UniProtKB/Swiss-Prot annotation:
Main location: cytoplasm
Record localization: Cytoplasm
Family annotation (CDD domains): YlxS_C
Biological function: Required for maturation of 30S ribosomal subunits.
UniProt organism field: Paraburkholderia phytofirmans (strain DSM 17436 / LMG 22146 / PsJN)
Domain of life the protein comes from: Bacteria
Keyword entries, A-Z: Cytoplasm, Ribosome biogenesis
Protein name stated in the entry: Ribosome maturation factor RimP
A GO CC term assigned to this protein in UniProt: cytosol
One of the GO biological process terms: ribosomal small subunit assembly
Alphabetical list of InterPro entries matching this protein: Ribosome_maturation_RimP, RimP_C, RimP_C_sf, RimP_N, RimP_N_sf
Length: 152
C-alpha cells in the first residue's frame, strides 16, 4: 500500500477528509485534514496518535509528523471540493494561459459534470471561465475576515 493510500484510509476511517499530504526532505510528514464542521486541536491529536501507530506498524520512515487543518486559504484539489465550496471566492492558477492569463480570482460555481465555472471581473465587466480539474495548477479559497465587533 502506498503512503498516500495508507494515510487516506486511516484519516477517512476516523471520519475526516485528507486534504493534502507533504513530505519534506528532512523527514517531516505534514498531513492536512478537514471535515464539514471544521477541525479542532483534539481532531489533530486523534489523527496524529492513530497515524503514529499505523506508520510504525507499516515501518514507514519519518522524523516528525504534523497534522493540521488546511487553514482559511484551503487548497481545492478534488471535484468534491469545488462542489462543497461553490459560491465562495477562490483564486485559480491554470497550467496554461487562457486569453493571456493564468491567474483568476472570482466566485466559484458548482461543477456541471467535469466542468467547473468561475465568475470573475474581466476587462469588459463580469465574465465566466469554464475549466476542468486537468486545467488547474493551483486553486485556493480566499480567506474571509470579519473584524467587526459582534456587539452593536
Amino acid at each position: 500500500m502506498q503512503l498516500t493510500e495508507l494515510i487516506e484510509t486511516t484519516v477517512v476511517g476516523l471520519g475526516y477528509e485528507l486534504v493534502d499530504l507533504e513530505r519534506t526532505g528532512r523527514g517531516m510528514l505534514c498531513i492536512y485534514i478537514d471535515q464539514p464542521a471544521g477541525i479542532a486541536i483534539e481532531d489533530c491529536e486523534k489523527v496524529t496518535r492513530q497515524l503514529q501507530h499505523v506508520l510504525t506498524v507499516e515501518n514507514i520512515d519519518y522524523e516528525r509528523l504534523e497534522v493540521s487543518s488546511p487553514g482559511l486559504d484551503r487548497p481545492l484539489k478534488k471535484l468534491a471540493d469545488f462542489e462543497r465550496f461553490a459560491g465562495s471566492e477562490v483564486v485559480i492558477t491554470l497550467k496554461k494561459p487562457l486569453d493571456g492569463r493564468k491567474s483568476y480570482r472570482g466566485i466559484l460555481h458548482a461543477p456541471q459534470g467535469e466542468t467547473i465555472g468561475l465568475e470573475f471581473e474581466g476587462k469588459e465587466g463580469a465574465a465566466m471561465l469554464d475549466f476542468t480539474l486537468a486545467d488547474i495548477d493551483k486553486a485556493r479559497l480566499v480567506p474571509k475576515f470579519d473584524f467587526r465587533s459582534r456587539k452593536q
